Amino acid sequence: MKQNDPVAAYFDKLPETHKRQFEERASGANFNFQKRLTLACELGGTSSGRLLDCAAGTGEITCALLKSGRFNHATVVDVSPAMLQSARSLLTSQIKNVELEFIESDVFTFKPTDSRFDIILCLGLIAHTGRLDILLPHLKSILTPGGRIILQTTLTDHLGTRTVRALTARSEIARRGYRISWFSQRDISDACDRAGLRILETRRHNVGIPFGDRFSPWANFQLEARLEKWASRHGADAIYLLGAG
């Protein structure tokens, strides 16, 4: 672990909590983590070859993509040793016909030892790192010609996101030890333009009721399920498929 890295220290406490988000439970968080997995698989459906997950967490999304049988290599990166170990346990038990490489690293300093990647997953990362103008050119530099990046963010264009940001900014710094980064659709679009990347497709999800799970996980789950179509157009979260411009 990078010494004194507050992001690594924060996520080292969360592997079990993170894994539970992908289980079949009636909460808004579970609904949206599973939706993120589904949409990532959908956007990555035409990719094959070499995969990089640059913030793998506990590995569920990586695992789902690798089970397609289209990939022969996966490099799994995470700054948190505990998260990376959880991902290693899952992937080595579930994936048998793919060359797997596990690297504890900050994605900003990660450099592949040999080949570039056909698809790069960047999910649940940029809120904790910011620095899009450094990250996106770096990811583009390790992408094959015709390769794709899947990038996820929560958007400040959404009223619920702005409400959460306004009410939690100070407490989040105290709780995590670092400041959360927030992005609008324009922020993402402009950063892609500067990096020479194009937004090829976008998927939206997450009704985004502020603190919905705190009041009633079951009711929040019902809202997410019933308003899924609305969220596909106006949701708080966006997942982008990027390619070189």
Which residues are covered by each model-predicted region?
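A conserved beta-strand element that flanks and buttresses the S-adenosyl-L-methionine
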Residues: L121
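A short glycine-rich, Lys/Arg-flanked "PGG" loop and its adjoining helix->strand segment in the class I
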Residues: D133-P145
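A C-terminal cap/extension of S-adenosyl-L-methionine-dependent methyltransferases
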Residues: V164-R170, E201-G245
